[in-house]
Amino acid sequence: MLKQRLLTGAVLGSLSIWAMLVFPTPGLAALLGLFYLIGAWEWGCLSSLQTLARRLLWLLAVMLLTVLIWWLEWANLSSPLYPAVLLGWGLICWVLFRIAVVAQREQGQVSFKWLLLGLFTLVPSYLALIAVHGSHQWGPKLMLYIICLLWVVDTGAYFAGKRWGKDKLAPVLSPGKTWQGVIGGLVAATFYALAGLYWLDWQASSVGFVLLTLLAASLSVVGDLLESLLKREAGAKDSGKILPGHGGVLDRIDSLLAAAPIFVAGLAWF
């Protein structure tokens, strides 16, 4: 199992880095869009959309919202509406998250709150990554920075949690996560941000960049817990089986759903 997980991770990671640095933005948008659609399909399944017709309608809704926002040019980093839209997204997610914690659905019952939450997490996350990739000459490197940040946070949290972990972060949703692991992930993110200043040749506020990185790192934990809550409510261990040793696509992008939109929105203020 571990060998399979490492092999899948190595192949997926290598291909992702190559695509981000080599592909033009339209090509990357198509490739990443396919990846996100698979994640959206898994989200629909976890939300108890049991028929093919309902799942296809759900995918259509995701695609239509994506096209609509893109057409309105809200995914442009220079647009003042972009931070406002993502702020609204954050508020909606917070409200729906609270609702999801309080009100559990019966097994097999379609969860419309989760479907709505899926629209306002999957779509902004996807558009944020594509927007940052095509926004500047160093956009591909910045997108890679965001993706690698989550890997760094996960790695730091894993080793810190394994060494010092005692206090459970969310025993019901994710028994393996501890507060010590979260702190370890944030410490790793701090050093990563300092290295990123030089790698990206960052010319704006260094303190602001580090703080934005730490905010995104913190929110990545929220995204992870959010997906854990969705899977728990659906009675599923993984979001899917498409990635051997890793589960589904959602299991790989859950941290991005919360972190990427806010990080990219924060870039608009520099």
Predicted regions and their residues:
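C-terminal transmembrane helix pair
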Residues: 231, 256-262
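Transmembrane alpha-helical segments of integral membrane proteins
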Residues: 222-238
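Generic detector of well-ordered alpha-helical packing
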Residues: 6, 43, 155, 225-228, ...
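Juxtamembrane boundary at the C-terminal end of a transmembrane helix
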Residues: 264-270
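Hydrophobic alpha-helical transmembrane segments of integral membrane proteins
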Residues: 120-121, 240, 257-258
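Hydrophobic transmembrane alpha-helical segments of multi-pass transport and channel proteins
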Residues: 217-222, 249-257
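Membrane-embedded alpha-helical bundles of polytopic integral membrane proteins
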Residues: 2-214
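Interfacial loop-to-transmembrane junctions
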Residues: 233-255
